[in-house]
């Protein structure tokens, strides 16, 4: 005010809410809650056989989606495969579809920081809450298929097998009009098939 110096004792313009007032705490704790739950989903997936250990099989993934009601059949899919440039191509196609008014899903790999980056809806990574909800839907069925595989003397579902089906469930729940799906390790035995 016209060069007037403010007394250092005067309160700041920024309002500090007293601890326990409830202001802002609910949103923060809810965000933290879902982030921690999503981290638990990621940990459960990472505890499985790694995605770079390809098992030449599709039947376990087929069994899992069958028990879930084939969520991947709810939307159209553009399947992107190749040696190089899959993620870029997937992103270009997904953006073009969005520009034409379609609700899109995008499945790419790898993620850099957080698992959610692999699964995007309308160009944005899926929320922690959506990831957790889909996981809660499929986890009991994953256990059933793992038990069936163990009874047949086969290894459990791998990281990528479960992730592919988790993605199918996330996109069905959204729901999306079209999924642009990047092949994981590629080839005939890729779980995205």
Cite the ranges covered by each PLM segment:
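Short N-terminal alpha-helical targeting/association segments
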Residues: 1-2, 174
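ATP-dependent carboxylate-amine ligase catalytic core
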Residues: 33, 37, 52, 61-73, ...
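N-terminal leader/targeting and accessory segments in enzymes
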Residues: 3-4, 10-11, 17, 22-84, ...
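Low-complexity, compositionally biased segments
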Residues: 5-12, 149, 193
């Amino acid at each position: 005010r016209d060069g007037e110096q403010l007394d250092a004792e005067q309160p700041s313009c920024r309002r500090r809410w007293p601890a326990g007032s409830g202001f802002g705490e609910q949103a923060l704790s809810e965000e933290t809650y879902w982030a921690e739950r999503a981290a638990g989903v990621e940990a459960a997936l990472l505890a499985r056989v790694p995605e770079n250990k390809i098992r030449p099989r599709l039947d376990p993934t087929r069994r899992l989606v069958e028990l879930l009601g084939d969520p991947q059949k709810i939307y159209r899919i553009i399947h992107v495969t190749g040696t190089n440039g899959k993620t870029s191509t997937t992103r270009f196609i997904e953006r073009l579809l969005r520009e034409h008014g379609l609700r899109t899903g995008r499945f790419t790999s790898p993620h850099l920081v957080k698992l959610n980056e692999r699964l995007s809806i309308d160009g944005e990574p899926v929320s922690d809450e959506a990831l957790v909800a889909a996981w809660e839907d499929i986890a009991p069925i994953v256990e059933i298929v793992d038990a069936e595989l163990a009874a047949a003397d086969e290894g459990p579902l791998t990281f990528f097998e479960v992730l592919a089906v988790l993605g199918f469930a996330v996109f069905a729940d959204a729901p999306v009009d079209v999924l642009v799906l990047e092949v994981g390790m590629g080839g005939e035995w890729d779980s995205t098939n």
